[in-house]
């Protein structure tokens, strides 16, 4: 999902899932067959064994208050009729933000985010390029021997605990 105007997203569980995907989707994937969340750690896609997805969902819920603040600033500069409409939206957003911090809303956000565009991944997509070898300091293209920066688009889950040194000799 491209960066939306968060104030246009609905104040619903699905709207919250869209917010989560828009804010953090670049570092989140979900594999339905594995029933696992994966998070990109800067070098590889690792299984979320610590509940990071729920922390990101909680952050998303808290950021609803920033959306309300932004709307309140717009309301101050608006004409009277538009100002009242924006004030009503601010009040609804603050109320929704408080409700969104509950466990049911957090779990709903996480559940619905699993299928948002860009989030689902199939097992066969992971580690699918046999010519990429992931080292601590980058990914080696085994066809060329070139070291390239880690890239989440490579969908690599493995990380060899070694530094690649192109000058090394055996």
Provide a role label for each language-model segment.
Residues 1-170:
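Intein modules and their embedded homing endonuclease domains
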């Amino acid at each position: 999902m491209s960066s939306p105007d968060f104030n246009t997203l609905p104040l619903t569980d699905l709207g919250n899932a869209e917010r989560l995907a828009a804010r953090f989707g670049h570092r989140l994937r979900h594999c339905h067959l594995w029933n696992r969340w994966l998070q990109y750690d800067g070098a590889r896609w690792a299984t979320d064994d610590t509940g990071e997805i729920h922390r990101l969902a909680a952050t998303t819920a808290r950021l609803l208050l920033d959306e309300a603040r932004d709307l309140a600033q717009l309301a101050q500069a608006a004409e009277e009729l538009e100002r009242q409409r924006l004030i009503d939206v601010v009040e609804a957003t603050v109320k929704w933000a408080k409700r969104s911090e509950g466990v049911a809303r957090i779990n709903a956000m996480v559940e619905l985010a699993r299928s948002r565009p860009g989030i689902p991944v199939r097992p066969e997509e992971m580690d699918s390029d046999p010519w990429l070898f992931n080292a601590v300091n980058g990914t080696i293209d085994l066809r060329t021997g070139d070291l390239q920066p880690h890239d989440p688009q490579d969908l690599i889950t493995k990380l060899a605990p070694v530094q690649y040194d192109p000058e090394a000799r055996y």
